[in-house]
Amino acid sequence: MESVSHLVSNGQSVLLVWSQGGQLDTLANFTSSLRERVGTNGTVAVENINRLSQSSYGSSTFDVALSNVVSSYCCKHTSEQLAQILKMLKPDCKCLLRDTSPSDQIRSELILAGFTNISIVAEDNATVKVNARKPNFEIGSSAALPFANKISLGGNSKMETAKMWTLSSQDFVDDDIDIIDENTLIEEDDFLKPDPSSLRSQECDSAKKKRKACKNCSCGLAEEIESEKKTNGNPVSSCGSCYLGDAFRCSSCPYLGMPAFKPGEKVALPSRLLQADV
């Protein structure tokens, strides 16, 4: 009891956490000593460390939390158990615990759980005794920042802000306001249709490589190439002289006996030439 007498006083609510392996007689005697210390106005709640998450105590219930301080048996606290103890403590209240983790590790675990003012009270080869404190605010609470205060404008700030962004109808007849004429934003040259050759990329006019329209061509090269394909799509014979007449035709030319025609002219063969010889 001497080791915790400076933490417990009359009228306080104390959370006593014990673990499996501890002697029940020692736990009962220690609990009785705590109840004598807090008096009739205080309370002592005894909870097993493995059942903290199932306890019915709410947030900010206890003034002091004592964990694993009853007997020589000690265990390692998990991050969930430390967070549960922090939740049950009132703001700016202390916690005394013993743990089997190294001092640096248990200090880090307590910091991650939300404790502050962590100090190592005693340490030996197997256990470490640590004092920690819950911050002087509730978990999840909020506070207004000093620079977030609104600056007074000498009146109603909302009305002043609305007035700042309001354009009065009287402003349109004020001679001091320079209003841009929308007709001056576009010049006469902007209405002229541009020459397609001026819109064509330099790569389109390159003579070193085959002309090929770009994807989503907008300079007119795609339409020009398409029209050239239609113009140059005339039938061409293997010898290239069928249109000159029989004197220039091969012996197997299907145009034998037909008059000469113009290059590219569509010529219909007689039906007798389309029938197979028997």
Swiss-Prot record:
Pfam families: Anamorsin_N, CIAPIN1
Cofactor(s) for this UniProt protein: [2Fe-2S] cluster; [4Fe-4S] cluster
Chief place where the protein resides: cytoplasm
GO cellular component terms given for this protein: cytoplasm; mitochondrial intermembrane space
Region N-terminal SAM-like domain, annotated ranges: 1-147
Record key words, sorted: 2Fe-2S, 4Fe-4S, Cytoplasm, Iron, Iron-sulfur, Metal-binding, Mitochondrion
Function comment: Component of the cytosolic iron-sulfur (Fe-S) protein assembly (CIA) machinery. Required for the maturation of extramitochondrial Fe-S proteins. Part of an electron transfer chain functioning in an early step of cytosolic Fe-S biogenesis, facilitating the de novo assembly of a [4Fe-4S] cluster on the cytosolic Fe-S scaffold complex. Electrons are transferred from NADPH via a FAD- and FMN-containing diflavin oxidoreductase.
Subunit structure: Monomer.
Official protein name in the record: Anamorsin homolog
